[in-house]
Amino acid sequence: IAIVSSPSGVDDGSFNQDNYNGVLKFIEENPNATVTPIREETGDSAAAVQAVADVVADYDVIVCCGFQFAGIGNLAQENPDTKFILIDSWPTVDGTEVTADQVIDNVYAAYYAEQESGFYAGMAAALSTTTGKVAVVNGIAYPSNVNYQYGFECGVKYVNGTEGMNVEVVELPSYAGTDVTGANVGGNYVGNFSDEATGKVLGNALIAEGVDILFVAAGGSGNGVFTAAKEAEGVKGIGCDVDQYDDGANGDSNIVLTSGLKVMHDTVYNVLNEVKDGSFKGANVT
């Protein structure tokens, strides 16, 4: 098994690590299996696909962590004996995303409803803020991250409407995101999933605007946001993808309010078991 990740690697304490934990659980139960973590250093989509192509002949199963790996569709068709687990996207073939019924036999691809956990994160933030200002910090404006952003905003709006509150979702125009279609989606985007320094700068900028609850969906960059929260007074963070309570430890206290779980490790673990028992089938699931 190979697992190819974004630049933040499989020890990012968030997205990549959750996928990796699914592999590790499978290996614990199947000690003859092995895993090789491969870190794609740039985050560029073409480079991500090339990183997979470079090792495709060496592994039975390749786990691809993130939207930037969507372009593996052609590669998968050219290598039918290799199984692919694609997280956060359906594959593209010749640059076009497949439809639900255009299954590639050796690709199990999974989308998640991030807007749902984002909604609850927004509710939690709106109900917990003392300053009346909250924000969401993302890495790159991939579809999954935009889902988190819009879900969060809707959660805050819902609380405002039902509880008679006026909580503001703060966005800094200089950190607005551009999605995969080229549209400006607003929000607060670090521009990377492995830039803790910029994450801290962005976190501090939001705190300076009065934000006291930060929903952090930025992978390794989010560690910098958490640092900014720890160094401030009365600021809380909401984790993403995994339970990030341990990341919130700050002396005798903890700055993590809650976390929005994605449970990708179960997907990876279950599909690896299907490979093992021969029941694996290509699929595009949500």
Ranges and model annotations:
Residues 1-286:
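A residue-level marker of the well-folded mature domains of exported/periplasmic proteins
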